[in-house]
A protein has these predicted regions:
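Short glycine-rich, Thr/Ser-proximal phosphate-binding strand/loop in the N-terminal lobe
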Residues: 48-65, 142-144
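N-terminal G-site helix/loop of the GST-like fold
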Residues: 28-54
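Anionic-ligand binding patches
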Residues: 2-7, 13-17, 22, 26-32, ...
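Short glycine-rich, polar/acidic loop-and-turn segments at beta strand-coil junctions
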Residues: 37, 57, 97-99
Length: 144
């Protein structure tokens, strides 16, 4: 499974890099996806938006007292800001998604065992999927 993810991520980076080059040569501002997620890249490809990807390295720990909505909004903003800080120009798109069940935020499972435990927790229960999105202009570092 990891090899398939790596293959998809490499293909997405290759395609997005080519699209970004074409966009830049046309004089258009580049869109940068602040994520290594093949799913997010797939969404942008499916809508036909040219982009490039740069992974953001941010602390994804839930802070004490932080509610789930504030959590995904903060992570989206921090990811976009981290990538924008390394760029001179362009629009940087950050996003984060989490699942909340019975008030508990479920992070990324560390391994297969934790993933199975999460699925058991979700079984037969209503849950929410929350996504935060932030757009940062690299030149001004202004967040939208």
């Amino acid at each position: 499974m990891d090899n398939e993810r790596e293959r998809q991520a490499a293909a997405a980076a290759r395609v997005s890099g080519e699209a970004a080059t074409a966009r830049a040569s046309a004089g258009l501002e580049p869109l940068v996806l602040a994520s290594a997620s093949p799913r997010r890249a797939e969404i942008l490809r499916n809508v036909g938006w040219p982009f490039e990807t740069q992974a953001a390295d941010v602390d994804e720990q839930l802070r004490d007292g932080e509610d789930p909505t504030a959590y995904v909004e903060r992570l989206a903003r921090e990811k976009a800001e981290a990538v924008a800080a390394r760029r001179l120009f362009g629009l940087v798109l950050g996003a984060d998604t989490t699942v909340v069940v019975e008030g508990r935020v479920l992070g990324k499972p560390a391994d297969d065992s934790e993933a199975r435990a999460m699925l058991r927790l979700l079984g037969g229960r209503t849950h929410e999927v929350l996504t935060g999105v932030a757009l940062v202009r690299a030149e001004s570092k202004r967040v939208r």
